[in-house]
Amino acid sequence: MDGLDNTTRLLAPSSLLPDNLTLSPNASSTSASTLSPLPVTSSPSPGLSLAPTPSIGFSPDLTPTPEPTSSSLAGGVAGQDSSTFPRPWIPHEPPFWDTPLNHGLNVFVGAALCITMLGLGCTVDVNHFGAHVRRPVGALLAALCQFGFLPLLAFLLALAFKLDEVAAVAVLLCGCCPGGNLSNLMSLLVDGDMNLSIIMTISSTLLALVLMPLCLWIYSRAWINTPLVQLLPLGAVTLTLCSTLIPIGLGVFIRYKYNRVADYIVKVSLCSLLVTLVVLFIMTGTMLGPELLASIPAAVYVVAIFMPLAGYASGYGLATLFHLPPNCKRTVCLETGSQNVQLCTAILKLAFPPRFIGSMYMFPLLYALFQSAEAGVFVLIYKMYGSEILHKREALDEDDDTDISYKKLKEEELADTSYGTVGTDDLVLMETTQTSL
């Protein structure tokens, strides 16, 4: 009776194992014919098809990617190469994104981002905020790059590197996301226009309600067959918008009413963000491990490195083409290359079951890592050379004869006041003449 129970438990369907997976003969004493692969449900056309419930059907020539973990990547399934098809984890072992540690880390990061956005809201100048609203050239340029250039670039990169359907969808989702909070912090570090940066972040998140599903519908037909409505990330985008608008609005109010308190909040928010970044990198490395990172194809790493660079370059190029001021150029550049990876991760978790998304759940984190590193290099270059170049240009402008500077105006005022005045020698001579008379 105990043996029958063990066999029943072994053959019971598990939500963590792919349906078409053939277990190795040494997995149990049951014969291999009992564990033969089940027929795969075919979709109308090759690729993924999303149903109203979170189930995905693959065409016969496609195989879902099992979820790898650090403990399950040591070997492969029988008859499969371990580097291309890692062995699934134990059914009782949860995936790393469902562990209590990851949930606690998400809460910690969310609270730190709210504090950061509160501090960035305290940097907004209400007097200059309206000027960007009346003339939204920078915001329009950022939106053009965000929802025009980057989705097309992600689509072309997925085709050029011949990514599989799951990896291509992850890359495309990241390319269609709106701007993230990283751009606001980096704009502050490079002396950018904070009013423009916050306007671009808010406007891109609002536009994502319409343009993000549209871009996904246009570019994802090669891999996904699904109605447009099922890809609308309204809940995730609305939550992102609220977590951005509410702290920023409160920070603007504090700056308007309590100027000294706003300065203190800015310092505290920057310190908390630095601590958050350190903790985030340490905990992410602890949860993932080198084995999981090694399971990601090299082409995905190349895409994660190249996409932020292309976004930064396109934003700066468009801002230069429209003759924006230097601080606005840096702001548009950083806003275009920085994506909201938290939103991309949330959509991947909601739209795809864990057994199909597999290691491609890591792509938004890879993109966040490389976009932060590249933006950090940009900040270091600006701090080392940008300030000196700007000071030299200001000195050259003061020495230019065609420039009417404060120094020249001051010299002219001194010359005008000395014209027609009476010197000391002349005054003594006049007094002597009057005495003699």
UniProtKB/Swiss-Prot annotation:
Q: What is this protein called?
A: Sodium/bile acid cotransporter 4
Provide the tissue specificity: Mainly expressed in the central nervous system cholinergic neurons. Expressed (at protein level) in motor regions of the spinal cord and rhombencephalon, in mesopontine cholinergic neurons, the medial habenula, cholinergic areas of the forebrain, and the gut myenteric plexus.
Known Pfam families for this protein?
SBF
What membrane topology was assigned to this protein in its record? Multi-pass membrane protein
> What is the documented function of this protein?
Transporter for bile acids.
Query: Coiled coil: which residue ranges?
Result: none
Bias (Low complexity) occurs at 21-50
Give a short account of its post-translational modification: Activated following N-terminal proteolytic cleavage by thrombin and/or proteases.
Its transmembrane ranges are: 104-124, 141-161, 198-218, 234-254, 268-288, 292-312, 361-381
Upper taxonomic classification of the species? Eukaryota, Metazoa, Chordata, Craniata, Vertebrata
Region Disordered: list its residue ranges: 16-84
Q: Which residues are glycosylated?
A: N6, N20, N26, N181, N195
Family the UniProt entry places it in: Belongs to the bile acid:sodium symporter (BASS) (TC 2.A.28) family.
What are the protein's UniProt keywords?
A: Cell membrane, Glycoprotein, Ion transport, Membrane, Sodium, Sodium transport, Symport, Transmembrane, Transmembrane helix, Transport
